[in-house]
Amino acid sequence: CIMHNVFEKGDRYFNTGDLVRDIGFRHAQFVDRLGDTFRWKGENVSTTEVENLMCSYHSLAEAVVYGVEIPNTNGRAGMAAITPHEGMEIDYAHLLEHLRKEMPSYAIPVFLRQQQKMETTGTFKYQKNNLKKESFDTNATHGEPLFVWLPNTDHYQLLTAEIWQNIQKGAYRF
């Protein structure tokens, strides 16, 4: 994202989402990532951008995106907790089709967790820490349905105990 007029009129600033430190001699040193991002397939994924694109889908009321670890992979895969608009059903095949048109494949959540209501703090911020901790473990998600976009498929499917075990064993190449 290139921003204009950040420090002075006419300047340009390339927002990488990285925090760097000036170590002198015209050198910068990487310190950390800013904002809520994760790295998947060698790319930085902005959770806010993915959430906004997901919420452009007609039947989704809310989306909370975060990164989760998959055994035998590098980085964190995208996962989204989603809630439908009241009285609406989510067509998961159509949702994936929509997401594939709107964003690069590395940014599309691999896992979805359908919730009736999002947990929020007293200041109405989403509770991502519990979602991250529970990850895509079917035993930790309180019976809420989980879906997975398996490699070489064109749809989300229900995450069963058998699929979960195969993911843990590294049977799929994400």
Residue map of PLM features:
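AMP-binding/adenylate-forming catalytic domain of the ANL superfamily
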Residues: 103-126, 143-171
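AMP-binding/adenylate-forming catalytic core of the ANL superfamily
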Residues: 3-107, 117, 122-126, 130
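Nucleotide phosphate-binding site architecture
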Residues: 113, 132-133
